[in-house]
Amino acid sequence: MVQVQVEFLGGLDVIFSKQRKHQVSVEGANGSVTVGDLIDYIVSNMIQKQKDVSVFLEDNTIRPGILTLINDTDWELEGEKEYVLEDGDIVSFTSTLHGG
């Protein structure tokens, strides 16, 4: 189990009880905990309304237009869903799509 900080920015906080920062404890299936495990946890435990899952996910991964950072580094450079989380990591999701 790891404890990480998860941030929802750029308006994403609306589907997470209007709270931007969350401290979460996540368990992994085989001992280590990946960002994929974190995403599963978020969908199962943190999104209040099932209809809002499509705002966050598309084709079982983070929706295009949402910048995902692990400790301020683009998750694409860290292995995306395969990145193994450690205690104290900060994972942020920022919507880059805004109304005007």
From Swiss-Prot:
It holds the Pfam family Urm1. This is Ubiquitin-related modifier 1. Keywords: Cytoplasm, Isopeptide bond, tRNA processing, Ubl conjugation pathway. The modification 1-thioglycine is found at G100. There is a cross-link at G100 (Glycyl lysine isopeptide (Gly-Lys) (interchain with K-? in acceptor proteins)). Belongs to the URM1 family. Acts as a sulfur carrier required for 2-thiolation of mcm(5)S(2)U at tRNA wobble positions of cytosolic tRNA(Lys), tRNA(Glu) and tRNA(Gln). Serves as sulfur donor in tRNA 2-thiolation reaction by being thiocarboxylated (-COSH) at its C-terminus by the MOCS3 homolog UBA4. The sulfur is then transferred to tRNA to form 2-thiolation of mcm(5)S(2)U. Prior mcm(5) tRNA modification by the elongator complex is required for 2-thiolation. Also acts as a ubiquitin-like protein (UBL) that is covalently conjugated via an isopeptide bond to lysine residues of target proteins such as AHP1. HAMAP family: Urm1 (MF_03048). One of its GO terms (cellular component) is nucleus. C-terminal thiocarboxylation occurs in 2 steps, it is first acyl-adenylated (-COAMP) via the hesA/moeB/thiF part of UBA4, then thiocarboxylated (-COSH) via the rhodanese domain of UBA4. It is found in: Cytoplasm. GO terms for biological process: cell budding; cellular response to oxidative stress; invasive growth in response to glucose limitation; protein urmylation; tRNA wobble position uridine thiolation. GO terms for molecular function: protein homodimerization activity; protein tag activity; sulfur carrier activity. It comes from the Eukaryota. Its main location: cytoplasm.
